[in-house]
Amino acid sequence: MASQTQGIQQLLAAEKRAAEKINEARKRKLQRTKQAKQEAQAEVEKYKQQREQEFKGFEQQYLGTKEDIESKIRRDTEDQINGMKQSVASNKQAVIVRLLQLVCDIKPELHHNLTLQKKLHGQFAA
């Protein structure tokens, strides 16, 4: 009987040690998983920074800096405004003369609807 109790005790102790080893293995696995996740995150962040740097280099090479774009837009806008001012200056007198002609030179005429009505009325009267 004592040997059975001792055998049971040994089995319980072995089961306890096995459970501890399983728990330790789970903890190590969890720790390795966390570490792998952190390493992967660091690698992703490094790759992201690298691609961002490449994009900035590409952008600067082909598009120029933001200030360059602003100054180019400003120059283009000023050129367009100056062109419009020159167009106004060169056509101003002709527009004034044309407006005065349209306002002052009145040619009385019958409205085209009235003319059409007279033509239609004349067809039915005949």
Curated annotation (Swiss-Prot):
GO terms for cellular component: presynapse; vacuolar proton-transporting V-type ATPase, V1 domain. It holds the Pfam family V-ATPase_G. GO terms for molecular function: ATP hydrolysis activity; proton-transporting ATPase activity, rotational mechanism. It comes from the Eukaryota. Belongs to the V-ATPase G subunit family. V-ATPase is a heteromultimeric enzyme made up of two complexes: the ATP-hydrolytic V1 complex and the proton translocation V0 complex. The V1 complex consists of three catalytic AB heterodimers that form a heterohexamer, three peripheral stalks each consisting of EG heterodimers, one central rotor including subunits D and F, and the regulatory subunits C and H. The proton translocation complex V0 consists of the proton transport subunit a, a ring of proteolipid subunits c9c'', rotary subunit d, subunits e and f, and the accessory subunits vah-19/Ac45 and vah-20/PRR. This is Probable V-type proton ATPase subunit G.
